[in-house]
Amino acid sequence: MGEFMNKKDMFVLGIETSCDETAAAIVKNGREIVANVVASQMESHQRFGGVVPEIASRHHVEQITLVLEETMKQANMDISQLDAIAVTEGPGLVGALLIGVNAAKALAFAHRIPLVGVHHIAGHIYANQLVQEMKFPLLALVVSGGHTELIYMKEHGIFEVIGETRDDAAGEAYDKVARALQLPYPGGPHIDRLAKQGKPIIDLPRAWLEEGSYDFSFSGLKSAVINTLHNAKQRGEMIRPEDMAASFQASVVEVLVRKTIEAAMHYSVKQILLAGGVAANEGLRTQLQKQMDQLPEVELVIPPLSLCTDNAAMIAAAGTVLFQQGKRATMALNANPSLLL
């Protein structure tokens, strides 16, 4: 314990319960993970083909105390040694968020520790800070189940959304296409795996939208996949699921990557960060790395898989920055399911 308990060090506890992961973590100086615990509920939601909010909330209630205890044990620390507690206040499922927010408030109140509210997407972006120091100005491509956004940052804590989805998020489209292909939930990893065995030979649309727009649209693509499968079935034709997965993924990835590269050029950024659950997608990671040749001056940062999906280390990392900027939450902090960045 002694060797890393230098009092100049700052220890922040992060708590994340926005969807179907109950997570807590302790991060040192905003960069170094001391403890990181995630209890996933994926199996409970699998048979429903999506996250059931009521079930998610019940699981969070069951898990939160255990997860917090395990985190303190992993870190070999006492709560009194924490400098701050950071918690996801939104966006997400209101019942799920409430569990984390109330746990954080209870700990902060009982132990007189400063409390910081964190935006879930800011957390995903700051997961990269655990890998590499952020260099501004930067561009973050955030791709998850509920979000697909291009975010420009010229300094810490300032987020400018320069592009977002106009309908389905990429992760949502993956889940719906996976269902059409009779693949299990969540769809992303299954399509990613299947795509490697197929060829992108099916002609599917790519929504570029109007000139100069960094927005995304995936509902037309999703409908095209469903219609193509339906029409083939009507005609008694067989479409290889591998080829459909490869074709769908090629369409999504091409749009995501091209718009990211164009925005990075336009905004003259020093870094591109990949963030969110779909950032774990191998097709996306590979294509983005390939296209970086066009931007020799720009550094690409991709977090390890464990930091792409929901976790609390990213919330602690983002919370550290907010805490250092003097941001504090009061005991009136509440879950905000539609919180804007």
UniProtKB/Swiss-Prot annotation:
It comes from the Bacteria. It is found in: Cytoplasm. Its cofactor is Fe(2+). Its EC number is 2.3.1.234. Keywords: Acyltransferase, Cytoplasm, Iron, Metal-binding, Transferase, tRNA processing. GO terms for biological process: tRNA threonylcarbamoyladenosine modification. GO terms for cellular component: cytoplasm. Belongs to the KAE1 / TsaD family. This is tRNA N6-adenosine threonylcarbamoyltransferase. The lineage of its organism: Bacteria, Bacillati, Bacillota, Bacilli, Bacillales.
